[in-house]
Amino acid sequence: MLVNETFFINSCDDEELDIKRTSNLEYRLSFDDEKEIKALVFITLGTGSNTNISFIDFDREYLAKNFPVAVVSVFYHCFCVRPNPTEERYSAKVNYENQDVINTFKTFKDFHFNPANSNPYEINRHLIDFNAYLSKLKQKSIMDKEARAVVSAIFYPPNDEYQNYGIMSAIDHINALKDLCKRYPKFKTLPKLWGGGSYGGYLALFIAKIAPWYVDAALDNSGSALPVLDYIIGRDLNKPEAYIKQWDNLWFNMFVKTKWNAKDENSPYFFSKEHYKIRSLLVSTHLELQAKKNEEQILISYHSKHDEFGTAKDKEILFNAYKELGLDATLHLIKDEKEIDKRYIKNLKHSLGMSDRALFRKELPALLERFEGKKFRLKKDSISYICGNLTYTFKDKGDKFKLDFTEV
């Protein structure tokens, strides 16, 4: 019989920015209690997964029904970064910060549009009127019918969350693992597999970096080996994270709420090269430490040579480094249409058209066979990475996994 459970736990605070977290972590579990469970599988969800929670549940339940595994979905810190049209509790809200208001009124001026007033709290009303104004310009052939005016806005995740990028998300996964093994002690001796696509793929490999003793296999589909700055300090770089076509005539450049900034070096929220370095997967000294902590990690990645985000070369460098350090690392670099099988790999674009479900469906049988008969245990450990004048120590402390963050 299929067992589905949902748990809420305390996880971690933002140690880098010294911010106390106010929300609990939610994670969901599925397994068939009539099967002998042979592995723990964590689907590391990617950006935008929150738009349809039923898809997440379907994928998790599918794997639990079709394989002898317990499957977990973790709704990590700042997981809800896009609007969810049916479930408000998992939906980011569109908002307008001061810079968005400035940008919008500048666009009004560029198009010679005079809003009813200059009240920034009525920006939605102004935009509706502006859209109608642009429709009239198109009707008079003053404006090209396919053209759109560009404005900006920001996604506010629920629960007062914000984009931390990588660290809190990864720690949440490990705390979910530790909590799960307290509830189900029999799971402690199972191999632990992590995997997902895009940001979810990055998270799987990042978890292998900050807690290698908890990763027996990490599966990645098209994750970036380097932090994506658009997601962290995109506002300051004028690089939106997402784009939305709204109504007939507007194009929204979208950012996600964050505490980080790239302009004020004296700010406690300045995103420094040290903060970047810890989130990078390509630091040679860090890779050496990771490999020494767990020489048995299995690392598997799929990546398009033609990925439109230009991340393929970095992934090649990363997997060559893994191999040179003696890790069991396999990169499937998809180079041309002959490698498109239509079952798993459907195109040469970012993420290859391959879902999380397909990624595990493809790799799980061989991994379960490799793990058959081996003994695994849930041990406690720690690892420290030096990044300039900062030291990041990721460690087990009591029943939690946490970050100790200190200046050298």
Where are these regions (language model features)?
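A short beta-to-alpha transition loop/helix N-cap that caps and shapes the active-site region
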Residues: 80-84, 224-232, 341
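Alpha/beta-hydrolase fold nucleophile elbow
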Residues: 186-198
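A domain-start/cap signature at the N-terminus of enzymes
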Residues: 1-39, 408
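Serine-hydrolase catalytic core
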Residues: 34-35, 244-408
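Glycine-rich nucleophile elbow surrounding the catalytic serine of serine-hydrolase chemistry
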Residues: 196-206
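Short, surface-exposed "cap/lid" segments of acyl-processing enzymes
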Residues: 26-135
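Alpha/beta-hydrolase active-site loop
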Residues: 93-184
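Hydrolase active-site cap/lid region
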Residues: 209-273
